[in-house]
Amino acid sequence: MIFTRCGAVLFLYLITLLLRAQNISVFTSVAPTTQTQGLVLPPTHDFQLLAQFGDTLADGSTLKTSPDFTAFVPKNERSDLGFLSLNHEIPDLQGGVTVFDLAFDKVNQIWEIGHGLPIDFSAAGGISKPCSGGITPWGTVISGEEVIQTTDLDSNGYYDAGWLVETRSSDRKFIQKIWKAGNAIHENCVVAADLKTVYWGADDFSYGYIFKYQAAQKRQLATGKLFVLVRDSPNASTATWVQVPNGTQAQCNNVNTFCQQVGAWNFSGIEDVEIGPYGQIYFATKYSGRIWRFKDKGPTVSDLNIFVENTQYPIQTADGIQWAAWGIGADNLAFDNANNLWVLQDGDNNHIWMVKPTHTAAQPKIELFATTPFGAEPTGISFTPNKRFMFLSFQHPSTNNTATIYDVTGKCVVFDRGTTIVVARKEFLGMSINDCPKPEPIPDLISFDFQLFPNPSATGKATLSSDLFQLGKSVDIAVFDPTGAICYTSKAVSNGKQVCLDFQPKAKGTYLIRVRLDGKMGVSTLIVR
């Protein structure tokens, strides 16, 4: 009997270790480089393309640009069935929210994206710059209009833009603009477990305030009391919630004026606000790059402090510890089921970070999950209920990006426009690498030579040199990994007799470099150490 109990305990322990090893948060950090033309993930993870700007929707319209909040809205708390609600951060009441049906094919381990339709905001006169957002416990999505538009085109007494906007994904319906929550440059919001309390911040350099809203009824946000955070002193870790008048249209339109008069603390550009695993409120500040947190005590706040400072951090990569600058622009936040805080960055290198729950200033615990495509800002971030799949988007990547990479379905992806993907560990998403489509064969005819230097290369970056290269003329470059698969392509422009190769390999090894120019082809090898 003792052996049986010990065996059961050991079995449960081993199962726990296995589940932890399969958590999305288990990875080795990527190298902290600047942006490249592709998405660089840890070798343990992969992605699937879901949507890109210009895709055709079910009604014949095309998917709008500027994807931001990327919300997986589950059906009945399932992790394999739900909706993808995608914000489009476009100004002048021309923004939008597109909702897709999503279902996970468990046999092939890929997401099937179906029926995509835009939500009709004509009843509200449109929606302007819907940025980040939050998923309510009752399954609706609340988006933040990240702009104040003081016109009143529909003559309802409220400004046209600058509100929290609630929608329902299941039937693609606009529900309401939440007037009583006040007019501000909204980013996102998060609803507490009591189904009545909502937190958010203003993404405003001059009026970067933290707000709390207490609805009059559970699941009904149309009416309620509004509060703003007033710090007890400039360096205090305590603060007080001061009620903001919101009884009239004028009061709702002008909450910033009142907040300034009562001394609300300006954090200068608040991005996402999230509730942590132990009830603390976390929020990101864009211009400082910091992540703050506090405990809400009802009428007051305690333990207001900086959780992540904008400084240098040691990152454990496959090649050892490298120091990385955190930088400004901490933006979208989300917690996984291991209590790690995921941080998407809008600014500096636009990285995707993960902060472990045991992180402190004295003993930092920060990982770098991904580097992003040239020009892109990573946006969105939401998880399935089991936290196995992460949904996110890339806003405004450079249209000059030409590098192609394969997603888990074998689809060739170029990050040259607004793009939405799902990410997971490889054991849960897609085919094995041996099942992936193979690239075109390399022709036998070699018609010119070129030189590569440095070779070997420590980073993958190199200069190609040939007398055939002409100033201002484009050269087609393809890189093949040791398995023979294309891992990088580029249409580079010669600066004379030389062309730059900005290749970021995922692993060390010998890579084949193919160059095509005016019907001629050259081949060489690059050693990455």
Predicted segments, located by residue:
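Bacterial Sec-dependent N-terminal signal peptides
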Residues: M1-Q22
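A general secondary-structure boundary signal
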Residues: L12, T140, W163, T197-Y199, ...
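Sequence/structural signature of beta-propeller domains
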Residues: Q22-P437
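Ser/Thr/Gly/Pro-rich low-complexity, disordered linker/stalk segments of secreted
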Residues: E440-I442
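C-terminal outer-membrane/trafficking sorting elements
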Residues: D444-F453, S457-R529
